[in-house]
Curated annotation (Swiss-Prot):
Residues 355-437, 709-738, 1312-1335 are annotated as: Disordered. The gene is RALGAPB. It comes from Homo sapiens (Human). This is Ral GTPase-activating protein subunit beta. Component of the heterodimeric RalGAP1 complex with RALGAPA1 and of the heterodimeric RalGAP2 complex with RALGAPA2. Heterodimerization is required for activity. Non-catalytic subunit of the heterodimeric RalGAP1 and RalGAP2 complexes which act as GTPase activators for the Ras-like small GTPases RALA and RALB. Pfam families: RALGAPB_N. One of its GO terms (molecular function) is protein heterodimerization activity. The modification Phosphoserine is found at residues 359, 421, 720, 1285. Residues 1149-1392 form the Rap-GAP domain. It comes from the Eukaryota. The keyword Phosphoprotein applies.
Length: 1494
């Protein structure tokens, strides 16, 4: 920088301004003169001044003569008061430039600059070290330094010449004391910090008021290079350069750039009046004032200064051993501190908060949105350094490292760790670099030379490598000798000789080297999307990584730890050629993650942080084998570092062959991990690799079935990945016992890298630990249960025993948690039990055949019983305790509700989902309105239904009139709408009295045919029958017979008349009867046979039925016991009737139908292009498929299927259009055709016409892509016929024509929701359909998924503005228990950022998803995901986020509980309180007749 300028070194050497005339006289003369002259002056200063008293020195001549004496007096020994008086006089006189006093001679006051310049030169004599009275000299020196500080700070009269003399004075006194080797306890050691502090402070003041010329800067740089063996020099330099950097960043990048905060004490070093240009110039010059800080790693360079050379030769002229200088033992720590200072500067330019060990941590303030701009270079172009190195870098000789060397005692303790990562706390995510940070090339142009040189300090490279001088260590012959002697010393020598410790050996420069490596890693990890880095920098960086990650020959633990700590996002930055170092990182991870103790790293770093960073790197490596397949990675140097020419590492390896190594690392990490955060990250990675493997194999199978061949897709089973390269890596790298990973590998040796093998390994590992190590940890348990739920959805065929193992482990976990002592029961514990029941439901719905096994069914039902009642009926060998004998005592109502939901799932959903009506609704798509509309009887209305309630939990709506469908009209039928806790179900029931065949083949109620009678009855004989036999007439009469007279004997005339009348009447009657008999016989002969009048026939069948009464009676609901009020209970009877005529009844029934049967979630998807910051810019991106990447549309299709909002019976993303079964018209099909012909992009899924939808048996999700309000309407009206051949357009017809999975039960003829379909979600929120009740739907979590083309734009995502666009209407419902407040913090809104990489993989950033139970899986911050698994993992993460939010909510009630509460409310409001006779009477009455007009 100052090569064309001459140093002032010769000027300083030739300057005799510090000598006096008295130096020409004998010492005794000078001492006596000085004592005599100085004493009166000093005594006058010590006494109070009297007004009017005259100064002893009046003329210029007197003053100058006295100053000659004082100059000599400053060289005297400190045994008397002379030197003190001299110092007092001079420190008083130099204040003439600040505030003149009476004690100052008048000539000095008149010409202060001239005299002060002379005084400063004289004061140099005070700082010459003396052999005795060191404390007195230190005190006097401090007095002078304080006076100098005051002079520089407060003087406004100093001329440039005085400033220059002052700077030279400070340089000279620093050089006098600091240039020689440090003597322990000497004056230099005590004054070093103050000396260098005053020098830098005064220099900064001079820059403000009188900027030093280049010769002064060059002189300062040369002199400071001679003082670097003092720790204080580097410390003070670091403070000054950090303070300057803080000011520089403030005006260079503006207030939006993260402020680099430094302690107030350091910031005060920079004068407030220093302008920006001065700050920039001063900063760059101060940066280079320390020369090359890498020199600090070479004792030979540090000891080659003139002052060292003076002591390097002893009296006899023989060279002294270099390691005899005790001050050199501080070089490793000084080197580290210099690297730490540079590291802080780099972090400041990157905008990363990184705590410093020496002062308050610099923390960034709010990062406001600023436009992206090019980095401002503070280096003048003509001064920018292009050199590779500033000192000689001879090739280092290869030498073996002794045992004592390898087992050296570490000089750092864990309490003062030399390494630190930007993420110091486990709960806070790593800070992102500032969006407006400089480019990587700019930072490397400024700091790269130093950092790369420091990163290769004392590295030993293989002889076969073509070494560049810029890549090797700094060496000289003397330093080689130093290292040779140090490395050959035995351990006994190090321990017995207190003059040596571990920090005297070159390997202890590892701390500084590690700091440089970590800084470079952070620089390259801060690469912006699309940024180009010079190949020279990339090659050196990869060389650094390969060197730092070596584990075969020599492991440098600090460097290895630093690289790992600072490289988590390294494989997420699209660095060109980064895959070259993948094998080396894998080898490093094999050293770190399976090691439980990490004892070799504990003295350097926090093991938990090291493991976390290793896991982050592992997360970014896992998709590579599947993604690149058989692509070969060139292994550059691994074999050469091992000195084994036959090593298999020299051979190129395929990425697929690394899969087994990565899986084993993952398994080993899970077995040894104890930190909850790290464990959850591993669990998320397990689901990622299992699902990716399953999808890849499924694609491979499809291609094989289709006849296609693809080497990159079908290799999973043919190439197991066990190659010579991967096989060698499984050997233990530590002398400990065999790692668990190898033991597990033996258990699953066959197909261990297949999807089925991975799934089995994952289930075994997770279930084993869930009921052992993890069951006490809530966060890990929850993540493990989420992993098991995800594994249940992986479509891979595994043995039923493995699936049963998962179900059994969840049951065992529930039993353990429920059986814990009462004092340990808490809401969090019950949340875990609820989560376990939810996991159990997932497994049962995904694998319903598991309940075909008796043992599994018994275990599951016992767990349900335990959750509902609090105990099992049978425990071990105890007697069975029946339900009626048990007193219900569940762990909590939440647990009971979860168990009831599980029971409902078992009884109603298993094997019945999805129903023929589709997955959009587990309920029947039928209600009263639908039945009325399609009934054939016009008299049917809503009052034609009878409403009953069973057991206070099920509402029955019975329609007795037939519907006119396929039901047989001859049999009694009833249509029942069953509204229970699980939803609304419609049953059409018919009383079946005959088998199905009899209905078709037999005539009902027709008797069997009879034979025709014969009219020929044979001959008829007329025989007169006598009442008595003939013998009666022959019997003679006796006297008694004659005692009764005959009739004529006693009849008188009057009686005769009457007798005759009677006789004639009888004759007439007989004739009439004979006539009738004849007539009857004639008619009888005319009739057919059989006589229909007299023939016996069966009664005709009933035509009108009261089927509701029959239904209730047949099911036993009409017993007297069912109608009685239960004793000692407030519950209603088992059967009650509801009065549907009470106003508001049907509104409440509709309200009940709107209560969802499953949890519902909403995801809003945004697309963010580079540089965008406003919500309108982001919303407009989805208006055309040409403005988004093709993978984005593919991603949308992987989330769910397209549904029409007007026809969809499930959740649509807004309450105004959800769960409706009567809201579509026939005109929508024509509109669909218009939409299909236009390029409206993903905005079709904005919730106006369509949304993306996903549902399973337990949850439903709506994926909404918000767009501007007018986008869809404009596209329909414009009729633009632009048919450009764009690749993205090919995807849209598939999206729009995708068949809906919902079943259209009936064609709908109701009016469409025109008002809501042309409004954005935020506008629809304020326009709900009139008359439609909206129930309080409880807690709602709105998850946002953001596709960002440029990763740095995450900082600019306007989440607060877009909150208005992600309304679902739930937050506006009345009495909503968790309606979103206007004060909702942005950090509480879960956001999943997806950034596509150039490799075709995707980088994940999670924001706001960390809740009470820590992070959510499977997606983890920093994870890399493949195209295949992206949709599944995002969807699963959304489900888990929302489930966790519901678990954390104090007011959340499951859907079945809310429905049960509403049913109870309906019963209480509309119960028909009738007496038993009245109830029975009402059953025989017709319903609906009096309300036909309504």
């Amino acid at each position: 920088m100052y090569s064309e300028w001459r140093s002032l070194h010769l000027v300083i050497q030739n300057d005799q301004g510090h000598t006096s005339v008295l130096h020409s006289y004998p010492e005794s003369v000078g001492r006596e003169v000085a004592n005599a002259v100085v004493r009166p002056l000093g005594q006058v200063l010590g006494t109070p001044s009297v007004a009017g008293s005259e100064n002893l020195l009046k003329t210029d001549k007197e003053v100058k003569w006295t100053m000659e004496v004082i100059c000599y007096g400053l060289t005297l020994p400190l045994d008397g008061e002379t030197v003190k008086y001299c110092v007092d006089v001079y420190t008083d006189w130099i204040m003439a430039l600040v505030l003149p006093k009476d004690s100052i001679p008048l000539p000095v006051i008149k010409e202060p600059n001239q005299y002060v310049q002379t005084i400063l030169k004289h004061l140099q004599n005070l700082f010459v070290p003396r052999q005795e009275q060191g404390s007195s000299q230190i005190r006097l020196c401090l007095q002078v330094l304080r006076a100098i500080q005051k002079l520089a700070r407060e003087s406004s009269l100093m001329a440039r010449e005085t400033w220059e003399v002052l700077l030279l004075f400070l340089l000279q006194i620093n050089d006098i004391l600091l240039a020689p080797p440090t003597v322990q306890g000497g004056i230099a050691e005590n004054l070093a910090e103050k000396l260098i502090g005053v020098l830098f402070e005064v220099w900064l003041l001079a820059c403000t008021r009188c900027f030093p010329t280049p010769p002064y800067w060059k002189t300062a740089k040369e002199m400071v290079a001679n003082w670097r063996h003092h720790p204080a020099v580097v410390e003070q330099w670091s403070k000054v350069i950090c303070a300057l950097t803080s000011r520089l960043l403030r005006f260079t990048y503006g207030p939006s750039f993260p402020a680099f905060k430094v302690p107030d004490e350091d910031a005060s070093l920079i004068p407030p009046e220093m302008d920006n240009e001065c700050v920039a110039q001063t900063w760059f010059r101060f940066l280079h004032m320390l020369s090359n800080p890498v020199d600090l790693s070479n004792p030979a360079i540090i000891s080659s200064t003139p002052k060292f050379q003076e002591q390097f030769l002893n009296v006899s002229g023989m060279p002294q051993e270099l390691n005899q200088y005790p001050c050199l033992k501080h070089l490793p720590q000084i080197f580290f501190r210099a690297m730490r200072g540079i590291s802080c500067l780099v972090d400041a330019f990157l905008g990363i908060s990184r705590p410093r060990s020496d002062s308050a941590p610099p923390t960034p303030v709010n990062r406001l949105s600023m436009p992206q701009s090019a980095a401002v270079s503070t280096t003048p172009p003509h001064n920018r350094r292009h050199r590779a190195v500033t000192v000689n870098k001879a090739t280092m000789k290869t030498s073996t490292v002794s045992t004592a060397h390898a087992s050296k005692v570490q000089h750092q303790t864990s309490s003062t760790s030399p390494l630190s990562s930007p993420n110091q706390t486990s709960s806070e995510p790593r800070p992102l670099p500032a969006p407006r940070r400089p480019k990587v090339n700019s930072i490397l142009n400024l700091f790269g030379s130093w950092l790369f040189d420091a990163a290769f300090v004392h590295c030993k490279l293989h002889n076969g490598i073509n070494r560049d001088s810029s890549m090797t260590a700094i060496t000289t012959q003397a330093s080689m000798e130093f290292r040779r002697k140090g490395s050959q010393m035995s351990t006994d020598t190090m321990v017995s000789n207190p003059m040596f410790d571990a920090s005297e050996f070159p390997d202890n420069y590892e701390a500084g080297r590690a700091e440089a490596c970590g800084t470079l890693c952070r620089i390259f990890c801060s690469k912006k999307t699309g940024e180009e880095i010079l190949p020279a920098y990339l090659s050196r960086f990869y060389m650094l990584l390969i060197q730092g990650l070596q584990i075969n020959d020599y492991v440098c633990h600090p460097v290895l730890a630093s690289v790992i700590l600072n490289s988590p996002p390294l494989f997420c930055c699209d660095l060109k050629g980064i895959d070259v170092v993948v094998p080396y990182f894998i080898s490093a991870l094999e050293t770190i993650l399976p090691d439980r103790e990490l004892s070799k790293f504990k003295s350097y770093v926090n093991p938990t942080e090291l493991r976390r960073s290793s896991i982050n790197i592992l997360l970014s490596l896992l998709p590579l084998p599947h993604h690149f397949g058989t692509v070969k990675s060139e292994v550059v140097l691994e074999g050469k570092f091992s000195n084994d020419d036959s090593s298999s590492y020299d051979k190129p390896i395929t990425f697929l062959s690394l899969k087994l190594r990565l899986v084993n690392i993952l398994i080993g990490a899970l077995q040894t991990e104890t930190d909850p955060n790290n464990t959850q990250m591993i669990l998320g990675a397990m689901l990622n690799i299992v699902q990716d493997s399953a999808l890849l194999e499924a694609i491979g199978c499809q291609m094989e079935m289709g006849g296609g061949e693809n080497n990159l897709k079908s290799h999973s089973r043919t190439n197991s990945g066990i190659s010579s390269a991967s096989g060698g890596s499984t050997e233990p790298t530590t002398p400990d016992s065999e790692r668990p990973a190898q033991a597990l590998l033996r258990d699953y040796a066959l197909n261990t890298d297949s999807a089925a093998g991975l799934l089995i390994r994952s289930i075994h590992l997770v279930t084993q630990r869930l009921n052992s190590q993890w069951r006490q940890d809530m966060s890990i348990s929850l993540a493990a249960l989420e992993l098991l739920s995800g594994l249940a959805k992986v479509k891979v065929m595994v043995d039923s025993g493995d699936r049963k193992r998962a179900i059994s482990s969840v049951c065992t976990y529930i039993v353990y948690q429920c059986s814990r002592p009462a004092p340990l029961h808490s809401r969090d514990l019950h949340s875990m039990i609820v989560a376990a029941f939810q996991c159990l439901c997932v497994w049962l719905t995904e694998h319903p055949d598991m309940l075909d096994e008796k043992d599994c069914l018994k275990e599951v039902l016992e767990i349900v019983e335990l959750g509902i009642s609090g105990s099992k009926s049978k425990n071990n060998e105890q007697e069975v305790k029946y339900k009626g004998d048990k007193e219900p005592n569940p762990a909590s109502m939440r647990v009971k509700d979860a168990a009831e939901a599980t029971l409902t799932c078992i009884m109603q959903l298993l094997g019945a989902f999805p129903s023929p009506s589709g997955p959009a609704s587990p309920c029947s798509l039928v209600n009263e309105t639908t039945l009325i509309k399609y009934s054939r009887l016009p008299t049917i209305n809503k009052h034609s239904f009878r409403y009953f309630v069973l057991d206070n939990s099920v509402i029955l709506a019975m329609l007795e009139q037939p519907l006119g469908n396929e039901q047989n009209d001859f049999f009694p039928s009833v249509t029942v709408l069953v509204r229970g806790m699980s939803g609304r179900l419609a049953w059409a029931q018919q009383l079946c009295l005959l088998p199905r065949g009899a209905k078709a083949n037999q005539k009902l109620f027709v008797p069997e045919p009879r034979p025709v009678p014969k009219n020929d009855v044979g001959f008829k004989y007329s025989v007169k029958h006598r009442p008595f036999p003939e013998e009666v007439d022959k019997i003679p009469f006796v006297k008694a017979d004659l005692s009764i007279p005959d009739l004529h004997e006693i009849v008188t005339e009057e009686l005769e008349e009457r007798h005759e009348k009677l006789r004639s009447g009888m004759a007439q009657q007989i004739a009439y009867e004979i006539h009738l008999e004849q007539q009857s016989e004639e008619e009888l002969q005319k009739r057919s046979f059989p006589d229909p009048v007299t023939d016996c026939k069966p009664p005709p069948p009933a035509q009108e039925f009261q089927t509701a009464r029959l239904f209730l009676s047949h099911f036993g609901f009409l017993s007297l016991e069912a109608l009685k009020e239960p004793a000692n209970s407030r519950l209603p009877p088992h059967l009650i009737a509801l009065d549907s005529t009470i106003p508001g009844f049907f509104d409440d029934i509709g309200y009940l139908d709107l209560l969802p049967c499953r949890p519902f979630d909403t995801v809003f998807i945004f697309y963010m292009k580079p540089g965008q910051k406003t919500n309108q810019e982001i919303l407009k991106n989805v208006e055309s498929s040409r403005t988004v990447q093709p993978h984005f549309l593919e991603f949308l299709l992987s989330l769910g299927w397209s549904v029409d909002v007007g026809r969809h019976p499930g959740w649509t993303g807004h309450v105004s259009t959800s769960w409706s079964i009567n809201c579509c018209d026939d005109g929508e099909g024509s509109q669909q055709e218009v939409i299909s012909s236009e390029d409206i992009g993903a905005s079709i899924f904005n919730g106006q016409k369509k949304v993306l939808y996903y549902a399973d048996a337990l949850t439903e999700i709506a994926f909404v892509v918000p767009s501007p309000v007018e986008s869809l309407t404009d596209s329909l009206e414009s009729n633009i016929s632009d048919q450009d051949s764009d690749s993205n357009m090919d995807l849209m017809p598939g999206i729009l024509k995708q068949p809906s999975l919902t079943l259209e039960l009936f064609p709908n003829h109701t009016d469409n929701l025109n008002s809501s379909q042309r409004l954005s979600p935020s506008s629809r929120m304020r326009k709900l359909p009139q008359g439609r009740p909206v129930p309080p739907l409880g807690p709602e979590t709105r998850v946002s998924v953001v596709w960002v083309e440029r990763y740095d734009d995450i900082e600019n995502f306007p989440l607060s503005e877009l909150m208005t666009e992600i309304s679902t209407g739930v937050e506006t419902t009345a009495n909503s228990s968790t309606s979103l407040r206007s004060t909702t913090l942005e950090k509480e809104v879960p956001v999943i950022f997806i950034h596509p990489l150039n490799t075709g993989l995707f980088r994940i950033k999670i924001q706001g998803a960390t809740g009470k139970f820590n992070m959510v899986i499977p997606l983890v911050d920093g994870m890399i995901v493949s195209r295949r698994a992206l949709g599944f993992l995002v969807r699963q993460t959304v489900i888990n986020i929302c489930r966790r939010k519901r678990l954390e909510s104090d007011s959340y009630s499951p859907p079945h509980v809310r429905r049960k509460q509403k049913i109870t409310d309906i019963v209480n409001k509309y119960r028909n309180k009738q007496l038993e006779p009245e109830f029975y009477t009402s059953l025989f009455q017709e319903v609906g007749l009096k309300n036909c007009s309504s």
